[in-house]
Each structure stands twice: as structure tokens, then as C-alpha cells.
């Protein structure tokens, strides 16, 4: 079962995907994301469709658990895995600058491609690591989800940006960056392109 359920308390959609509980624990001596494992070709970076997606291009009809108050919707969308490297134990910070460039190019390509689907309203690129958050694959990877809705937190951020602009005639993100740079206490790194 994969469906979206409206959560009236937080006024946001929640993904329900019971089939994800069936994800296997991989043997310690085999990894499907390593080229030698036989599931993926040789690669530097690779897009791989998630074997256990929470969102589907052809979702089933939701279970009959809805009424006027508890709404459900098909779990339309796309879930992709982005393999960072064929090296099984490397982490993102250990990748070379040129390799990270290839990864960013792939993220950009996938973002642009998923954004062409009129049913996808938000594209989320992320990495989660460790068994504690449910990661079953230790191989270095991230994910991209194409949501059929804009998550509430993102709606709030957009609303804050609009309201700040209407009130102050300036970009809120630009103002935050300006304040951080002037305050200096929280800036970790800065160059001509980025401030962290």
C-alpha cells in the first residue's frame, strides 16, 4: 500500500508506504550498488530508481479509509536513488571536487527532468545515513523525491519570503545572508560563491 493521507493537525500530507517495511537487510559481503554486485553498470555517479518507492508514477488507488474529514490521495510521484560513487566506503566529503561536480550535475539534470512533470510540485534532494533513520544500504547514496504537493514547511518559507518582500521591498534570503556576513559570529566559511 502506498498513499497520501491528509494530517488535519499539521495540515499537511503524509506519505504512507507499508511496502517499504519489506526492504531487505543486505548481506554484509554483497552490495547491489557496487558495480561488482551485478545490479548496476560501471559508473562514476548514477541515477537508480528506488526499488521500494514511497511515491509511484502509477500509484494504486488508496485504501478505503477516507471520509470528509480524513482525506486520502494516490501516492503519485517519483523516488530515485543517486549513487555518489562506485567506492563502497567513501563519504560525500571525501569525494574530489571534480567528482562532486559530476554529482551536482546529475542532481541538476534530475531536478530539471522531474520538474517537467506537471503533477510534481516539489523536488527534494537529500541524503540520510545510518540504520537509526531506516537506511538499509551503507553504500554512499542520496535520494530525490518528486512530491505531488508542496510540503507545509516549504510553503511557510515561501510565505515568509513573500511577506518580507511586501513589507520591506527586499529579498528575505538576501537579507539573512547580509546579516550573517555582518554579524560574522556564525560564518564558518566564505568565498566568492558561497557563505556557510
Language-model features: where?
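Active-site microenvironments that recognize anionic phosphate/pyrophosphate groups
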Residues: 1-139, 145-196
Amino acid at each position: 500500500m502506498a498513499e497520501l493521507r491528509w494530517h488535519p493537525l499539521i495540515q499537511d500530507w503524509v506519505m504512507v508506504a507499508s511496502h517499504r517495511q519489506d526492504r531487505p537487510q543486505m548481506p554484509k559481503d554483497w552490495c547491489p550498488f557496487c558495480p561488482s554486485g551485478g545490479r548496476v553498470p560501471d559508473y562514476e555517479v548514477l541515477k537508480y530508481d528506488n526499488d521500494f518507492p514511497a511515491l509511484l508514477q502509477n500509484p494504486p488507488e488508496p485504501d478505503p479509509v477516507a471520509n470528509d474529514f480524513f482525506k486520502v490521495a494516490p501516492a503519485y510521484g517519483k523516488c530515485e536513488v543517486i549513487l555518489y560513487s562506485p567506492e563502497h566506503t567513501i563519504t560525500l566529503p571525501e569525494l574530489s571536487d571534480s567528482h562532486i561536480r559530476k554529482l551536482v550535475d546529475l542532481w541538476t539534470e534530475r531536478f530539471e527532468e522531474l520538474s517537467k512533470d506537471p503533477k510534481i510540485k516539489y523536488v527534494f534532494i537529500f541524503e540520510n545515513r545510518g540504520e537509526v533513520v531506516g537506511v538499509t544500504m551503507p553504500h554512499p547514496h542520496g535520494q530525490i523525491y518528486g512530491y505531488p504537493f508542496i510540503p507545509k514547511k516549504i510553503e511557510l518559507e515561501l510565505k515568509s519570503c513573500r511577506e518580507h518582500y511586501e513589507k520591506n521591498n527586499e529579498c528575505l534570503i538576501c537579507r539573512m545572508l547580509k546579516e550573517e556576513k555582518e554579524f560574522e559570529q556564525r560564518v564558518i566559511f566564505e568565498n566568492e560563491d558561497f557563505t556557510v
